[in-house]
């Protein structure tokens, strides 16, 4: 694999901070550069923040921004950090854009975390590493990467009862 992996930041649990005074979660800055350094990433990754929002607040206009950035991106390998609550919706929008050739010849991986990186016990670092590996090894298409597994955009759902992603049965 040659070239740079583009890492688009959209917010989600990955980047949430904890307010010790009132117990709320909020966004400050992305942790992605710190995570890449901590994970000793030796792949050329360019980080770009598109937005810092909870995925429950994401709407079609936000998805259009993500889609447009993926379409214009010179890299053929893209990782998108995303909140897990609506990740399938964004994956579907991107997958449909690839199906109708609005986006072509790109491997796009959406990745999230169930626990904020700032908490220390987060699954985010593991998920990010897996997403970067999948971006380099999977054929062009749109995928969701969580917990060491990857799923095609049209065959994934979040199982809220167990807190994991799974294939649609």
Model-based region annotation:
Residues 2-169:
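Active-site histidine-anchored catalytic micro-motif
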